[in-house]
């Protein structure tokens, strides 16, 4: 069985991990970093960039650079690039392809399976969209796992010998979750979860961006938010300032030539203090308090029952966030995990559980939101309450609302509001063929089945006729099977094009290298190369120069090989000549030595004769 990788598909950064020797290991990307920016860009020539290289060129290419796509998962949002619409699943798939390729390079084998994390508060359509993104990227998503749960898996892997309750506060780039788990005897049981899928580090950046833009507008009368390139520079500066204010109390924001008007170029040079930043973002920090209270209440615990507090997500490095969590829990958060990597590591642990590499761990997760159907009067009738352990199956008997009704429409909703219209619609389907009868007589059994990924299947059965209908929830905002298949083919085409571009670069680099090395060697050898040989090599050099900048890779390869082979003949010939000359020289020296030795031997004989001692007679 091949390796199953663990992926944290984040709003601003993503990370991939794998189990090695019983422990999760973060896989560095091709650029050497342990996390990859969740950024996709398209160049003018159609080339696709993902990760750090995409983020680097965002200022000069703002229209074709896509960031924070995770915030649109499970919606009908589309990104238009060069006249083509891309769904959030397709853009996310490009990020997943990059992570998959980095993992394959690290492991030296093909990777086809993954465990992918999602915010605990992701609804059904957002989870399904994540799974679809994996499929488009060529990954069989074996499990969708909640981010705080994954973090607790990584945190608790070496702490399974004792029972304790963990409070996980997860503030990422675009989403916020809080989960309370109980760990004991290898069982990770989620007691409750709460959160906000529209709150994260991006919002803290936005506060700084707005502050800079408003200050600049007040001084210069120009709103930089109307200039895409200036806006991208503002975003980068805001993110940098936020990070610096985590370790220092003041930072300088310097953006020369940010714009210009009739009076000339305009610059930004201003200081931002941590105190001002905390004032600007106080409402965001405050917005995380209520979900913490709700999670505790749903878990039927008090803060005194909590043993450990774990911070997850890069935004938890913000001092005001840490202070808020510490004040609420009364406990110092654990510093033993890297907030940027722990979720991916937990996903790798879950992958290890699936492959059997990690034993004696049982993960009991929950569904974050109440699931139900619309009943008479537009009421939302719950079948599965929020924080129910999954996988689970619940059934309930309903009946008709009118006499002689032969069909019923099943409207599935997700949320905590009392009226169906105020909750999120997950799907609709119809059960027909019901035997005519007075209202309230037919018995229709509606069953909700949630799998371990948190994805819902709904069925309805008329107990009188045995007629049955069912639906696996795929919201209208998600891609259809045909659209997914089409996206898979396009992703494969993109991958093939990327591979072709890579091959083109390598072939042309080899050609340039062969030209340079041969020209240099010819120059260094000078007159040692015979004119005929030099002419042959120069012909091959010229032949390669003629084709090296074209797109016919086979012609470039052929010309490179012919040049290399021709020069090899010349160098072999020179080597043989040098060897022959050296051998002749050695023979001449040896002859001279032998003559000297013969003379020396005669001399020795004379000396021996002179000093010959004879016995006395």
UniProtKB/Swiss-Prot annotation:
Biased composition (Basic and acidic residues): 600-617
InterPro entries membership: ATPase_NBD, Chaperone_DnaK, Heat_shock_70_CS, HSP70_C_sf, HSP70_peptide-bd_sf, Hsp_70_fam
Feature: compositional bias, Low complexity: 578-592
Pfam families per UniProt: HSP70
Organism superkingdom: Bacteria
List of residues that carry Phosphothreonine: 175
CDD domains to which the protein is assigned, alphabetical: ASKHA_NBD_HSP70_DnaK-like (cd10234)
Record's note on what induces expression: By stress conditions e.g. heat shock.
Coiled coil stretches, renumbered: none
Gene3D superfamilies referenced in this protein's UniProt entry, alphabetically: 1.20.1270.10, 3.30.420.40, Actin, Chain A, domain 4, Substrate Binding Domain Of DNAk, Chain A, domain 1
Protein family per UniProt: Belongs to the heat shock protein 70 family.
Name of the molecule in the record: Chaperone protein DnaK
């Amino acid at each position: 069985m091949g390796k199953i990788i663990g992926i944290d598909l984040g709003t601003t950064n993503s990370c991939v991990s794998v189990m090695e020797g019983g422990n999760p290991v973060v896989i560095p990307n091709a650029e050497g970093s342990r996390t990859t920016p969740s950024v996709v860009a398209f160049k003018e020539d159609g080339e696709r960039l993902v990760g750090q290289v995409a983020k680097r060129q965002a200022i000069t290419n703002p229209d074709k650079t896509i960031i924070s796509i995770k915030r649109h998962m499970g919606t009908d949002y589309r990104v238009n690039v060069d006249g083509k619409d891309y769904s959030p699943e397709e853009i996310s798939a490009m990020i997943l392809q990059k992570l998959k390729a980095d993992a394959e390079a690290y492991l030296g084998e093909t990777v086809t399976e993954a465990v992918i994390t999602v915010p605990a508060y992701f609804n059904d359509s957002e989870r399904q969209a994540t799974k679809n993104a994996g499929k488009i990227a060529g990954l069989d998503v074996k499990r969708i796992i909640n981010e705080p749960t994954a973090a607790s898996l990584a945190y608790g892997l070496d702490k399974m010998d004792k029972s304790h309750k963990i409070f996980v506060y997860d503030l990422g780039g675009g989403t916020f979750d809080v989960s309370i788990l109980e760990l004991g005897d290898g069982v990770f049981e989620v007691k409750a979860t709460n959160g906000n899928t529209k709150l994260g580090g991006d919002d803290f950046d936005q506060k700084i961006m707005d502050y800079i833009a408003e200050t600049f507008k007040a001084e210069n009368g120009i709103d930089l938010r109307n200039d895409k390139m200036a806006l991208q520079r503002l975003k980068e500066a805001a993110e940098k300032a936020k990070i610096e204010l985590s370790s220092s109390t003041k930072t300088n924001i310097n953006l020369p030539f940010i714009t210009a008007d009739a009076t000339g170029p305009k610059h930004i040079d201003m200081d931002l203090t941590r105190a001002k930043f905390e004032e600007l973002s106080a409402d965001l920090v405050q917005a995380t308090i209520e979900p913490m209270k709700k999670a505790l209440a749903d878990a039927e615990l008090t803060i005194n029952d909590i043993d450990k507090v774990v911070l997850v997500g890069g935004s938890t490095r913000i001092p005001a966030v840490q202070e808020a969590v510490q004040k609420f829990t009364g406990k110092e958060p654990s510093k033993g995990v890297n907030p940027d990597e722990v979720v991916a590591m937990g996903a790798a642990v879950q992958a290890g559980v699936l492959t059997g590499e990690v034993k004696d761990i049982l993960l009991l997760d929950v569904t974050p939101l109440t699931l139900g159907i619309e009943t008479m009067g537009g009421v939302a009738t719950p079948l599965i309450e929020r924080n129910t352990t999954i996988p689970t199956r619940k059934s309930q008997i309903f009946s008709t609302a009118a006499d002689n009704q032969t069909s019923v429409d099943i409207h599935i909703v997700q949320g905590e509001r009392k009226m169906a219209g105020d909750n999120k619609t997950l799907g609709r389907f119809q059960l027909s063929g019901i035997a005519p009868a007075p209202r309230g007589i037919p018995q229709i059994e509606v069953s909700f089945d949630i799998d371990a990924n948190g994805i819902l299947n709904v069925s309805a059965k008329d107990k009188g006729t045995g007629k049955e209908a069912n639906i696996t929830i795929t919201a209208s905002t998600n891609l259809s099977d045909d659209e997914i298949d089409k996206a898979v083919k396009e992703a494969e085409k993109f991958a093939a094009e990327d591979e072709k571009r890579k091959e083109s670069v390598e072939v042309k680099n080899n050609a340039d290298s062969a030209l340079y090395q041969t020209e240099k060697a010819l120059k260094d050898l000078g007159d040692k190369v015979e004119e005929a040989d030099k002419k042959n090599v120069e012909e091959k050099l010229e032949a390669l120069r003629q084709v090296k900048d074209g797109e016919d890779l086979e012609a470039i390869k052929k010309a490179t090989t012919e040049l290399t082979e021709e020069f090899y003949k010349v160098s072999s010939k020179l080597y043989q000549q040098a060897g022959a000359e050296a051998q002749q020289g050695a023979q001449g020296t040896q002859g001279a030595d032998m003559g000297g030795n013969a003379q020396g031997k005669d001399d020795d004989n004379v000396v021996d004769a002179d000093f010959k001692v004879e016995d006395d007679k």
